[in-house]
């Protein structure tokens, strides 16, 4: 459950390390974002000489949350940290690698690239 001002780890090699949610996209007064939702983020911490710089604003998709996601069989998949993958204007990932596991809920037409790059799909 991500809302405005939430900080997230970055799960790709775009160069950003920490980002802060500045808007939850999808609806006029939408408050929370979960796994698979697109948010607008600002880069708060980045590595030197990388594509993403501190202060840059990007779209991102949430790939891991502490709140988790409930499956139809009743099981819940939760993670230790909140994480997102930075996206370009065409909603394609900026990085070429994904770090850490992602969930099956990302397996739709928009995010198949992220699922195929991920080392583990839960």
Swiss-Prot record:
Disulfide cross-links: none
* Presence of the UniProt keyword Isomerase in the record: no
Q: Show the GO cellular component annotation of the record.
A: cytosolic large ribosomal subunit
Instruction: Quote the SMART domains the UniProt record gives.
Output: Ribosomal_L14
Listed under GO biological process in this entry are: translation
- Entries under InterPro entries matching the protein: Ribosomal_uL14, Ribosomal_uL14_bac-type, Ribosomal_uL14_CS, Ribosomal_uL14_sf
- What keywords sit in the KW lines? Ribonucleoprotein, Ribosomal protein, RNA-binding, rRNA-binding
Write down the Gene3D superfamilies for this protein, in alphabetical order.
Ribosomal protein L14
Annotated GO MF terms = large ribosomal subunit rRNA binding; structural constituent of ribosome
What this chain does, per the record? Binds to 23S rRNA. Forms part of two intersubunit bridges in the 70S ribosome.
State the family named in the UniProt similarity comment for this chain.
Belongs to the universal ribosomal protein uL14 family.
Note the NCBIfam families from the entry. Answer: rplN_bact (TIGR01067)
Task: Describe its assembly.
Answer: Part of the 50S ribosomal subunit. Forms a cluster with proteins L3 and L19. In the 70S ribosome, L14 and L19 interact and together make contacts with the 16S rRNA in bridges B5 and B8.
Name assigned to this protein: Large ribosomal subunit protein uL14
| UniProt lineage | Bacteria, Pseudomonadati, Pseudomonadota, Gammaproteobacteria, Alteromonadales
As recorded in Swiss-Prot or TrEMBL, the protein's gene is named rplN
């Amino acid at each position: 459950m991500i809302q405005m001002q939430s900080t997230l780890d970055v799960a790709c090699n775009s160069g950003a390390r920490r980002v802060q949610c500045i808007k939850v996209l999808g609806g006029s007064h939408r408050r929370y974002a979960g796994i698979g939702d697109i948010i607008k983020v600002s880069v708060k911490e980045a590595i030197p000489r990388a594509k993403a710089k501190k202060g840059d604003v990007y779209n991102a998709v949430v790939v891991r949350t502490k709140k988790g996601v409930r499956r139809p069989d009743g099981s819940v998949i939760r993670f230790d940290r909140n994480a997102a993958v930075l996206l370009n204007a065409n909603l394609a990932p900026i990085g070429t690698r994904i770090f850490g596991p992602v969930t099956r809920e990302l397996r739709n037409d928009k995010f198949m690239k992220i699922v195929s790059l991920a080392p583990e799909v839960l």
